[in-house]
Amino acid sequence: MKLVEIFTDGSCLGNPGKGGIGIVLRYNGHEKQVSKGYLQTTNNRMELRAVIEALAMLKEPCQVQLNSDSQYMKDGITKWIFSWKKNNWKTANGKPVKNKELWIALDQEIQRHKIEWTWVKGHSGHRENEICDELAKAGANNPTLEDIGYNAD
């Protein structure tokens, strides 16, 4: 299996508001950077979407070192999702899981890969996280895409 390093970040100008994702993907000494902007969304949706988009870029199953400053995303996919699926996508207190369709998409993307999840402290000088932050902000400042599934309720 190829070893791929992925760094992601999501940004939102206002919450909700215009949002963006930033991705740095590194394989075999090569680095690819991605920035996309969304017209109306939330910060958590952007954190999730960044990881989904990054994993979708991989053409074959890989060993992935995935780095994100989103504790929400990391805890959701490594801890909470198992209970959510058992409880028909309800939280521990019986409420519907927010961003359900993105969690389902992320759960589908991770099935192909062997992933090591790492939380990175945001805004702390971590090179790739800072790059992702800039890419996400650039996307949020120039949004062109609709965040399908976003519901303001």
UniProtKB/Swiss-Prot annotation:
Residues 1-141 form the RNase H type-1 domain. Its EC number is 3.1.26.4. CDD domains: RNase_HI_prokaryote_like. Binds 1 Mg(2+) ion per subunit. May bind a second metal ion at a regulatory site, or after substrate binding. Mg(2+) 2 binds at residues 9, 133. GO terms for biological process: DNA replication, removal of RNA primer. It is found in: Cytoplasm. Mg(2+) 1 binds at residues 9, 47, 69. InterPro entries: RNase_H (IPR050092), RNaseH-like_sf (IPR012337), RNaseH_domain (IPR002156), RNaseH_sf (IPR036397), RNaseHI (IPR022892). It is an enzyme of class 3 (hydrolase). The keyword Hydrolase applies. GO terms for molecular function: magnesium ion binding; nucleic acid binding; RNA-DNA hybrid ribonuclease activity. Monomer. NCBIfam families: PRK00203.1. Endonuclease that specifically degrades the RNA of RNA-DNA hybrids. Belongs to the RNase H family. This is Ribonuclease H. It comes from Actinobacillus pleuropneumoniae serotype 5b (strain L20). The lineage of its organism: Bacteria, Pseudomonadati, Pseudomonadota, Gammaproteobacteria, Pasteurellales. The gene is rnhA.
